[in-house]
């Protein structure tokens, strides 16, 4: 702590990312990264972008990438906003659409950056408690508020809300912005993008980090009514006009174009997920229904902390949350088939031997 910090810095509780230890080689199943690399076309596009033009600033409008996304979703370019990862877009959205005198609503067990941003920007907020099945109680999100944000599928639970239920939520909040954070939508759910033109209060946020294997580039995008997008651009251009570098723009554009590779790896991950769920259930885990690239599971006898610590000793990282209601759960990213086979093997060993120190 420094004497030069202002009160906000002293008070804020920052987001804590998944651990990335360097002490040994781990199988990383803790940060929901894609286990497969970007496509060859993406890597080639990025290599080609490493040239003398790096002396120049990148395109502040991200026009080529915007055009590619517009073609992909059949939208107008003024309905698309590009950001430095979906986290940046979420931060801009909190600044753009939510006011200090109106309470915003989001689930109590979801992406913890929502709470961080609300407190960082001094916003009034209410955490809506998930029900006993870890479902988001949508009726609670329909009461008077200053805006709503929910992840779909939810993280860390992986549970998905159908489009009809979300349409009802949006209709109940016609005078307020409803943000649907679709970071994991490509692994089983239906995007709300197709309903965008029905609702001028709907903002959909997606990322290239998960299904497009580009977590290292930090590129995300928002889709919504042109007036919402204009608001985001006003905030962006009041902070940093050049949020995406040239290499990232080239790689992201190629990733959107290479839909064949995208479809292949997402299907592969979903297939692996289905297999892993069955194997975990055989080991006496309770696994929540997931439409994401991870599963949320608790064991009927062993604690989440015990399993997490022993897996780490065995060279496997999973995400453990030391929080009320979910402290016995583990969030396990779906890796390659080979990685998940090793996970199941190690779990079988840990549980059968009741090892506390390995």
From Swiss-Prot:
Cofactor(s) it depends on: pyridoxal 5'-phosphate
Pathway: Amino-acid biosynthesis; L-histidine biosynthesis; L-histidine from 5-phospho-alpha-D-ribose 1-diphosphate: step 7/9
Record-linked InterPro entries: Aminotrans_II_pyridoxalP_BS, Aminotransferase_I/II_large, HisP_aminotrans, PyrdxlP-dep_Trfase, PyrdxlP-dep_Trfase_major, PyrdxlP-dep_Trfase_small
Domain of life: Bacteria
GO annotation, biological process: L-histidine biosynthetic process
Record's keyword annotation contains Glycoprotein: no
Enzyme Commission number(s) from the entry: 2.6.1.9
Protein's UniProt keywords contain Transferase: yes
UniProt enzyme class: transferase
Modification N6-(pyridoxal phosphate)lysine, positions: 210
SUPFAM superfamilies per the UniProt record, alphabetical: PLP-dependent transferases
Keywords, sorted A to Z: Amino-acid biosynthesis, Aminotransferase, Histidine biosynthesis, Pyridoxal phosphate, Transferase
Family statement: Belongs to the class-II pyridoxal-phosphate-dependent aminotransferase family. Histidinol-phosphate aminotransferase subfamily.
HAMAP family named among the record's database cross-references: HisC_aminotrans_2
Assembly and binders: Homodimer.
Record-linked PANTHER family: HISTIDINOL-PHOSPHATE AMINOTRANSFERASE (PTHR42885:SF2), HISTIDINOL-PHOSPHATE AMINOTRANSFERASE-RELATED (PTHR42885)
Protein name (record): Histidinol-phosphate aminotransferase
Species of origin: Clostridium beijerinckii (strain ATCC 51743 / NCIMB 8052)
High-level lineage: Bacteria, Bacillati, Bacillota, Clostridia, Eubacteriales
């Amino acid at each position: 702590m420094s004497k030069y910090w202002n009160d906000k810095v002293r008070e804020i509780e920052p987001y804590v990312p998944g651990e990335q230890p360097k002490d040994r080689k781990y199988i990383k199943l803790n940060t929901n990264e894609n286990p497969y690399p970007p496509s060859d076309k993406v890597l080639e596009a990025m290599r080609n972008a490493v040239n003398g033009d790096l002396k120049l600033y990148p395109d502040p409008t991200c026009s080529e990438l915007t055009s590619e996304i517009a073609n992909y979703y059949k939208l107008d370019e003024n309905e698309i906003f590009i950001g430095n990862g979906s986290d940046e877009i979420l931060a801009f959205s909190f600044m753009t659409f939510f006011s200090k005198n109106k309470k915003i609503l989001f689930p109590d067990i979801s992406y913890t950056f929502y709470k961080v941003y609300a407190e960082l920007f001094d916003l009034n907020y209410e955490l809506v408690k998930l029900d006993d099945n870890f479902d988001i109680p949508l009726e609670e999100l329909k009461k008077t508020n200053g805006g709503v944000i929910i992840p779909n599928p939810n993280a860390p639970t992986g549970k998905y809300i159908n489009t009809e239920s979300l349409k009802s939520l949006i209709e109940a909040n016609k005078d307020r912005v409803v943000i649907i954070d679709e970071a994991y939508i490509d692994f089983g759910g239906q995007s709300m993008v197709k309903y965008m033109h029905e609702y001028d209060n709907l903002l959909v946020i997606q990322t290239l980090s998960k299904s497009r294997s580009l977590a290292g580039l930090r590129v995300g995008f928002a889709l919504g009514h042109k007036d919402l997008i204009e608001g985001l651009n006003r905030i962006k251009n009041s902070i940093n006009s050049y949020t995406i570098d040239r290499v990232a723009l080239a790689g992201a554009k190629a990733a959107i174009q290479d839909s064949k590779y995208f479809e292949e790896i997402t299907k592969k991950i979903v297939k692996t997920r289905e297999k892993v769920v069955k194997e975990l259930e055989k080991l006496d885990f309770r696994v929540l229904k997931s439409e994401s690239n991870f599963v949320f599971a608790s064991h009927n006898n062993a604690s989440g902390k015990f399993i997490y610590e022993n897996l780490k000793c065995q060279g496997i990282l999973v995400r453990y949350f030391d929080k009320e209601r979910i402290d016995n759960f583990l969030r396990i990213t779906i890796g390659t088939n080979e990685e998940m086979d090793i996970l199941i093997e190690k779990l079988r060993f840990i549980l059968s031997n009741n090892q506390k120190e390995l």
